[in-house]
């Protein structure tokens, strides 16, 4: 029985030593990274800084044209001088 307890204590000690060596290796790897890395910032953009034509079209579709004074059925009234071409939406 004493041999079993002693053997399991050695096995647990071996696992602990191995885990400590792995943890120390991870800490060394973190310190070997470039100094000042936490102060660096990077911005990534996948588009035109002023916006794309697709975004402009989506904004135009989201905002309906204001009703013209002569026709209450606007924004789709063909008689309105502004709404058929959607020039009343700012871009």
Swiss-Prot record:
Query: One Pfam annotation, family name?
Result: Defensin_propep
Report what the protein is called. Answer: Alpha-defensin-related sequence 10
Superkingdom of origin? Eukaryota
- State the encoding gene: Defa-rs10
The family classification in the record reads: Belongs to the alpha-defensin family.
Alphabetical keyword list = Antimicrobial, Defensin, Repeat, Secreted, Signal
Q: Which InterPro entries match?
A: Alpha-defensin, Alpha-defensin_N
> Which tissues and organs express this gene's product?
Paneth cells of the small bowel.
| Chain positions covered by the region annotation 7 X 3 AA tandem repeats of C-P-X | 65-85
């Amino acid at each position: 029985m004493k041999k079993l307890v002693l053997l399991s204590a050695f096995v647990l000690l071996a696992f602990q030593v191995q885990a400590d060596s792995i943890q120390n290796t991870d800490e060394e790897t973190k310190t070997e990274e470039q100094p000042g890395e936490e102060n660096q910032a990077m911005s990534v953009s996948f588009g035109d800084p002023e916006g794309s034509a697709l975004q402009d079209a989506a904004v135009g579709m989201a905002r309906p044209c204001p009703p013209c004074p002569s026709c209450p059925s606007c924004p789709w009234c063909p008689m309105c001088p502004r709404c058929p071409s959607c020039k009343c939406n700012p871009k």
